[in-house]
Amino acid sequence: MLKKDMNIADFDPQLFQAIADETRRQEEHIELIASENYTSPRVLEAQGSQLTNKYAEGYPGKRYYGGCEHVDIAEELAISRAKELFGATYANVQPHSGSQANSAVFMALLQGGDTVLGMSLAHGGHLTHGSHVSFSGKLYNAVQYGIDEATGKIDYAEVERLAVEHKPKMIIAGFSAYSGIIDWGKFREIADKVGAYLFVDMAHVAGLVAAGIYPNPLPHAHVVTTTTHKTLAGPRGGLILSACDDEAIYKKLNSAVFPGGQGGPLMHVIAAKAVAFKEALEPEFTAYQEQVVVNAKAMAKTFIERGYDVVSGGTDNHLFLLDLISKDITGKDADAALGLANITVNKNSVPNDPRSPFVTSGLRIGSPAITRRGFKEEQSVELTNWMCDVLDDITDQGTIERVKNQVLELCARFPVYG
């Protein structure tokens, strides 16, 4: 018999210490990685439930195992809430990650070797949008578009030119490091012009979309994917959505997830997704997303005022890229210096970056996590000035130590889990 008082601390003190140290790091460090967020205790409760014990291959009402009547309810709740949240007529909540959701879309709509047109990783796209190191670039003929160097915005004329030239079977819109607002309708016009599917990856802005702050791609795209963490602030996982009202596509998508790419779904994670979707339907979630954008704009503006270059000159969403080329600082060194001051960012390539992806010339900065712990515009500006103090001279240990102490004081005032 398994006793309820079993615990990690007694059985595996090494692992327990690692978990405790990470918990402390999250409380004492300021998190600015745009793809990270803090999920709620309710989501953590669902994810740590006994649903983790249940195998449930298949879909609600059509499983390959018995005893699924209760987990069916959990999955049906997640599906119905996802549809309501985004205005979808189809939702698959089983993908284990955003990349696996994207893989399922490729599998459902394409054949190996088909041409796809996606945003270059070097210009803000994602690995799964056609990068040569990803399945999307290895198994398919990937053509890449980028941004206009003068404006920092997507060059729709280039997208259309490449689409007409290469006749892709699928066009991918979406990003991992782009601070503008995408014109989903323009992408659909281009896709229709060449007879392509439009696939939107809204992983980074799904929370903003759910709150009505960022344009919803569902009315324009054949298929939309997202992660369920990031701005949605749920558990780590993936989601596929559609409002194209094409049952044939829906069937292909379901088959591509199971049995095409996955076996048993993670029912404890699906339950956690259901909780997160319910949270996102609450009015408080909209207020949170509005503050996310306010904070990001305030940070970008402050960096510019302090003499730093921001790609595209600002942001319209939750993130922006800091271009450090003019400061002759690598993203790697900037990341390390800020880390010593308890500020967590990630190095990131900037458009036409002369340095390798392992070094880079920029930082990607996002506001979802700091906003989640209660930061407003005042704290965001204060934090940005501290970051500039560190970046002005990354070798100044006195400044780094001073900023670290300021960060610790600020974190104590705004705990993640109060």
Swiss-Prot record:
Q: Which GO molecular function terms does the record list?
A: glycine hydroxymethyltransferase activity; pyridoxal phosphate binding
| SUPFAM superfamilies per record | PLP-dependent transferases
GO BP, one annotated term: glycine biosynthetic process from serine
Which catalytic reaction applies to this protein? (6R)-5,10-methylene-5,6,7,8-tetrahydrofolate + glycine + H2O = (6S)-5,6,7,8-tetrahydrofolate + L-serine
Q: Which Gene3D superfamilies match?
A: Aspartate Aminotransferase, domain 1, Type I PLP-dependent aspartate aminotransferase-like (Major domain)
A Pfam short name: SHMT
Top enzyme class, one word, equals: transferase
Residues of the site described as Plays an important role in substrate specificity:
229
Q: Does the keyword Magnesium apply?
A: no
Alphabetically list the UniProt keywords: Amino-acid biosynthesis, Cytoplasm, One-carbon metabolism, Pyridoxal phosphate, Transferase
Cite the binding residues for (6S)-5,6,7,8-tetrahydrofolate. Answer: 121, 125-127, 356-358
- Kindly tell me the pathway this chain contributes to: One-carbon metabolism; tetrahydrofolate interconversion; Amino-acid biosynthesis; glycine biosynthesis; glycine from L-serine: step 1/1
N6-(pyridoxal phosphate)lysine-modified residues are 230
According to the UniProt entry, what is the EC number of this protein? 2.1.2.1
Q: Which cofactor does it need?
A: pyridoxal 5'-phosphate
Query: GO terms for CC?
Result: cytosol
Top-rank taxon of the source lineage equals Bacteria
Is this entry keyworded DNA repair? Answer: no
Q: Where would you find this protein in the cell?
A: Cytoplasm
PANTHER family in alphabetical order: SERINE HYDROXYMETHYLTRANSFERASE
| Function in brief | Catalyzes the reversible interconversion of serine and glycine with tetrahydrofolate (THF) serving as the one-carbon carrier. This reaction serves as the major source of one-carbon groups required for the biosynthesis of purines, thymidylate, methionine, and other important biomolecules. Also exhibits THF-independent aldolase activity toward beta-hydroxyamino acids, producing glycine and aldehydes, via a retro-aldol mechanism.
Family to which this protein belongs = Belongs to the SHMT family.
**Record note on quaternary structure:** Homodimer.
Name the chain's protein: Serine hydroxymethyltransferase
> Species lineage, top-down?
Bacteria, Pseudomonadati, Pseudomonadota, Gammaproteobacteria, Alteromonadales
